[in-house]
């Protein structure tokens, strides 16, 4: 194991201040009127097989098919866990958020597993239990985590039924249930049309209407309360990507869809204006999948819904955002950590490969292959978009030669830190 010296020295750098820069990269691509003509309606942009296309799913899933079925089988007899009022109140009373998040998260994991299992098998074996999960979620007063419910107007911990909170959790559930509606509406209607009718209603109220009409959420970076240059983090691309996929899967009125898409562009532009042009992730390497990674998800979806006409992957800033994760890796499972990021990691191999493909980075593709040694079936929990997107490139990733060339010097002048290394890093395997 060779010695590596990695220096992160924000405090030793010249004290140059790099402020908010109004780049507005996305809005420079198009205006609202031109955007309307670009949009692909009626889910014609979806390239995945319909649920009933069994040969299509067998081909798409390949050797991963059985893994999804086995995961779903674990939940065939799952007992859905009630999240009690006192579980929400615990956050206000004692600061305990896990008492609410643990059962809530397990329920959400069950829905995701059942959804993917039924897509994989296609025999209806998982549908009833999937319906149970869908209806269970529809009956909840809120899809937000207890720690975030306080964003509602009352600022209290118990959810208000008429004031939906759009946080990371609500957006993630919106993503998952929008795909559920898209793939299984016809199957649900054969059981009882009320299932899909109720699901569509809850998605409209909690996700679509809330995004369009409530600008009170800080991550949106809009409204009279927002001041340009105020701190924005991974919540912005993460929540906006979830909002965008919901609109893409559910909204087919051209004017409404254009309004929503353009609102996401304005919001994500504020994030891209806030972060530094050098591409470093200020939140640390373990947040890369949530900040640059969710920016990738968002930009891919935006390109898809506009038929490739709104595409900023050629921007050097975007490529630098992607390559930050490979530059942070020093070998043997270690990364250069700071803030509250972990020192162990390297990232989601499929996400890294997708980023490399989008920005044409052989560095990222080779690094993704290095991170993909286990070669397990792609799984991103209730982030169905990311699981499906990972499956699309799974074979390409498996055929890519692993490689991580340790860069001797990477300087991030605006974020003000630098990576310096000697020789080959901690693990010789990382340089192959």
What do the predicted segments below correspond to?
Residues 1-4, 295:
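Positively charged n-region of N-terminal signal peptides that target proteins for export
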Residues 4-13:
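Sec-dependent N-terminal signal peptides
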Residues 72-84, 130-148, 197-223, 259-279, ...:
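Long, well-ordered core segments of solenoidal/helical folds
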Residues 109-124, 161, 172-191, 239-254, ...:
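Well-ordered alpha-helical scaffold segments within catalytic/enzyme domains
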Residues 156-286, 297, 392-406:
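Active-site lining segments of carbohydrate-active enzymes
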Residues 292-432:
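Carbohydrate-active enzyme catalytic cores, enriched for enzymes
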Residues 20-92:
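Low-complexity, Ser/Thr/Pro/Gly-enriched N-terminal "stalk/linker" regions
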Residues 88-99, 149-168, 220-234, 242, ...:
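Carbohydrate-binding/catalytic loop surfaces
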């Amino acid at each position: 194991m060779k010695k590596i010296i990695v220096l992160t020295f924000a405090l030793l750098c010249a004290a140059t201040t790099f402020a908010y820069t109004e780049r507005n990269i996305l809005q420079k691509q198009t205006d609202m009127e031109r955007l309307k003509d670009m949009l692909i309606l009626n889910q014609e942009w979806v390239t995945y097989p319909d649920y009933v296309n069994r040969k299509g799913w067998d081909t798409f899933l390949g050797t991963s098919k059985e893994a999804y079925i086995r995961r779903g089988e674990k939940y065939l007899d799952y007992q859905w866990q009630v999240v009690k009022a006192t579980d929400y109140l615990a956050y206000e009373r004692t600061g305990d958020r896990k008492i609410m998040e643990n059962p809530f998260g397990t329920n959400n994991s069950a829905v995701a597993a059942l959804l993917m299992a039924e897509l994989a098998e296609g025999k209806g074996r998982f549908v009833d239990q999937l319906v149970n999960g869908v209806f269970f979620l529809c009956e909840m007063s809120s899809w937000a985590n207890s720690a975030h419910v306080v964003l509602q107007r009352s600022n209290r911990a118990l959810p208000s039924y008429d004031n939906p909170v759009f946080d990371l959790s609500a957006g993630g559930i919106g993503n998952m249930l929008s795909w559920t509606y898209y793939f299984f509406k016809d199957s649900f209607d054969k059981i009882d049309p009320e299932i899909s009718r109720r699901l569509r209603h809850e998605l409209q109220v909690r996700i679509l209407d809330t995004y369009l009409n409530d600008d009170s959420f800080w991550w949106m970076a809009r409204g009279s309360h927002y001041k340009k240059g105020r701190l924005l983090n991974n919540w912005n691309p993460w929540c906006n990507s979830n909002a965008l996929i919901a609109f893409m899967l559910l909204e087919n009125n051209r004017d409404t869809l254009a309004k929503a898409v353009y609102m996401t562009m304005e919001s994500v532009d504020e994030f891209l204006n806030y972060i530094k042009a050098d591409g470093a992730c200020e939140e640390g390497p373990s947040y890369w999948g949530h900040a640059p990674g969710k920016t990738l998800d968002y930009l891919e979806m935006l390109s898809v819904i506009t038929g490739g006409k709104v595409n900023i992957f050629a921007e050097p800033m975007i490529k630098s955002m992607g390559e930050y994760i490979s530059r942070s890796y020093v070998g043997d499972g270690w990364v250069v950590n700071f803030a509250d990021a972990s020192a162990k990691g390297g990232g989601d191999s499929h996400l890294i490969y997708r980023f490399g493909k989008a920005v044409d980075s052989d560095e990222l593709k080779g690094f993704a292959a290095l991170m993909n040694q286990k070669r397990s079936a792609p799984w991103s929990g209730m982030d169905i978009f990311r699981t499906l997107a990972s499956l699309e490139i799974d074979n390409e990733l498996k055929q890519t030669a692993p490689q991580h060339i340790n860069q001797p010097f990477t300087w991030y002048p605006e974020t003000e830190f630098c990576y310096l290394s000697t020789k080959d890093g901690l693990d010789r395997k990382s340089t192959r």
